[in-house]
């Protein structure tokens, strides 16, 4: 696919970053959760203060995937103290990886994932890990095809609903 670029997100990109974050999260999980829980989650976690703070956090890195100049998806990587769990002090967490619906099933998720692996190796990380909702079969299958295996789980709260995320990892050697 021509015209594909992965570029780092900065504070000037915040309005576009908020928009794609809300769109992709709602598209991915809206049908499986109540409108009330979804609205509460989006209001609390995908806003200017929260995402602006995340962009400024040391050890957190955001990237847009652009196709012919249009933002098609994004990726959030965490290292060191920015990781959400104490999985491995030398780990790389993929905290978020999302594509707009119109860009799915075109190999772009694979490109974002491979970019994350490259960053992990560039940063001399030994383990790549992430959390995935236990009911997100498409994502679980994708991660299995990329060599990740389940090692634990944690609770993810969406609105008032306590859900289970499986934690998956793979070695970066």
From Swiss-Prot:
Gene Ontology molecular-function annotations: acyltransferase activity, transferring groups other than amino-acyl groups
Domain N-acetyltransferase: 4-173
Domain of life: Bacteria
Signal peptide from the UniProt entry: none
EC number: 2.3.1.-
UniProt-listed PANTHER family: AMINOALKYLPHOSPHONATE N-ACETYLTRANSFERASE-RELATED-RELATED (PTHR43877)
The protein, known as: Uncharacterized N-acetyltransferase in pepI 3'region
Organism: Lactobacillus delbrueckii subsp. lactis
């Amino acid at each position: 696919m021509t015209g594909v670029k992965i570029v780092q997100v900065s504070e000037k990109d915040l309005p576009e970053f908020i928009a794609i974050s809300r769109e992709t999260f709602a598209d991915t999980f809206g049908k499986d959760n109540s409108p009330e829980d979804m609205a509460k989650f989006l209001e609390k976690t995908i806003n200017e203060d929260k995402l602006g703070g995340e962009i400024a956090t040391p050890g957190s890195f955001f990237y847009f995937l652009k196709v012919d100049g249009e933002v098609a998806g994004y990726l959030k990587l965490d290292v060191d103290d920015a990781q959400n769990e104490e999985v491995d002090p030398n780990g790389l967490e993929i905290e978020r990886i999302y594509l707009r619906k119109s860009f799915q099933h075109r190999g772009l998720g694979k490109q974002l994932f491979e970019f994350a692996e490259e960053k992990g190796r560039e940063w001399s990380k030994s383990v790549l890990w992430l959390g995935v909702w236990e009911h997100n079969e498409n994502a679980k299958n994708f991660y299995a095809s990329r060599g990740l295996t389940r090692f634990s789980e944690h609770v993810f709260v969406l609105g008032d609903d306590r859900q289970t995320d499986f934690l998956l990892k793979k070695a970066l050697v």
